[in-house]
Regions:
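Juxtamembrane/disordered regions of integral membrane proteins
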Residues: 1-113, 117-138
Length: 138
């Protein structure tokens, strides 16, 4: 059980750190220019916390630890990329379909970002999961 907790924490930490840098620094002007008219002055912290607590569960379940963590690194990273692509495409394409003025270029950038972010976060989770599993065998 501890290896799953370690995988979750590893996934969560990488997800949080990298996404906060992306959202807070790198892509902030991109989002402000593209959807600034829709953005709240302050983020809804409970909703953000819920996302960051729930999303790693999906990455753990589908990419880091299916079949008790037996996936290879390449299979883990591919599964994480597919999971991220589908999750972010669902969000962005739904917004593109239903919200007036949602920028097409921003949707595609965000889908690519979600794919990359999910892959990196799962790498952190797999490293923590595998390391903890190896320690348990000692």
């Amino acid at each position: 059980m501890i290896k799953y907790a370690a995988g979750y924490v590893g996934t969560l930490l990488v997800l949080l750190v990298i996404d906060l840098i992306w959202l807070g620094v790198i892509a902030k002007p991109l989002y402000s220019n593209g959807i600034g008219h829709l953005m709240a002055e302050q983020p809804n912290l409970w909703a953000a916390a819920a996302f960051y607590l729930i999303y790693p569960i999906g990455l753990i379940y589908f990419s880091v630890a299916p079949r008790n963590g037996a996936l290879s690194w390449s299979d883990t990273l591919l599964a994480a990329a597919v999971f991220g692509f589908i999750a972010y495409a669902t969000y962005d394409l739904s917004n593109l379909a239903t919200l007036k003025g949602w920028p097409t270029h921003l949707a595609f950038i965000d889908i690519v970002w979600g794919t990359v972010l999910s892959t990196l976060a799962a790498a952190g989770g797999k490293a923590a999961f595998d390391w903890t599993a190896a320690q348990a065998l000692r």
